[in-house]
Amino acid sequence: AEGNPVGRFAGYHIGAVAADGTKIAPRHFSYDWLNMAFTAAATYKMTKQFGFTADFTYNTQRPNMSNFAPAEMPNVDKITIPLGRAGIYFNNDWISLTSLFSYIAKTNNNSTLNLINPNNDKDIKAAALSYDIETIGWTTDAVVKPFKGFDFHFLFTYQSPKYKKYETGVTFSDGTTSGINATGNIVTEIPKVLIELDPSYNITKDLKVWASFRYFSKTYANIKNAYYFNGRWETFGGINWNVNKHLSLSGTVINFLNQTGAKGSISGAELVDKENAA
């Protein structure tokens, strides 16, 4: 709609007239942007085996075509993604260890929420939304080789990604308002704790057995953090055999410990509050 955003309605098409008298018409727009990326890294060696390391990345983006789908124009402000990490490393003949603290954020994420009129569940209106997310974290990554042929990879990550400025609302044709405020809530589908355990053993130089154990802590299934999925393990295992220079064989077993769990979101529950969760 030219200048006046309205929700979809029966018979919606170019030239149609909404209940408030707004005529549906194409809205023309034209933008020309340059996205940039910067990276810097530094390492300081205290000894031959121990030192400090840090890196920083700064990316910029702009909205893509899908962000212009709602009736309202999206926020076209620059999207910035700063990532900074700093920590220590230690290497010798049997261990390679890195432990880093990190910070990452993303500003001006564009999204669309379908808000429902509390007096008429068939009256649904799309609301454009621009919000930020950020997290601090800690990651420790190690590869241990205690004896010949055996490798053990360990990865631990703690993070706490949260929404910032996650607020929007709409006014329906009957004057009723509906809105959402999820500022400070944990980002959906992202676990706070990640663990990877990856042992492997070379029986011979051509025959290797391996396994992988991955843990994902509790993840929230809706924006209001009313629903969540419990933490879960994923397991994999396999064998790799280099028969000769022309032939390699491998076999993989998935979920060999018969672990159960779920991930993702719950359709239709995006706006359910903790107080109203069943």
Language model: regions and residue ranges:
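Gram-negative outer-membrane beta-barrel transporters
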Residues: 2-10, 14, 30-32, 41-61, ...
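Short, intrinsically disordered, charge-balanced linker/junction segments flanking boundaries
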Residues: 1-3, 40, 48, 66-71, ...
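Hydrophobic, lipid-facing positions within transmembrane beta-strands of outer-membrane proteins
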Residues: 36-40, 82-86, 136-140, 193-197, ...
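Outer-membrane beta-barrel domain signature, strongest for Gram-negative TonB-dependent receptors
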Residues: 83-100
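Short acidic, glycine/proline-rich loop/turn micro-motifs
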Residues: 65-70, 111-113, 165-168, 221-225, ...
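C-terminal beta-signal and adjacent terminal beta-strands/loops
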Residues: 112, 217-220, 240-278
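A subset of solvent-exposed loop/turn segments in beta-rich extracellular surface proteins, enriched
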Residues: 2-21, 115, 268-277
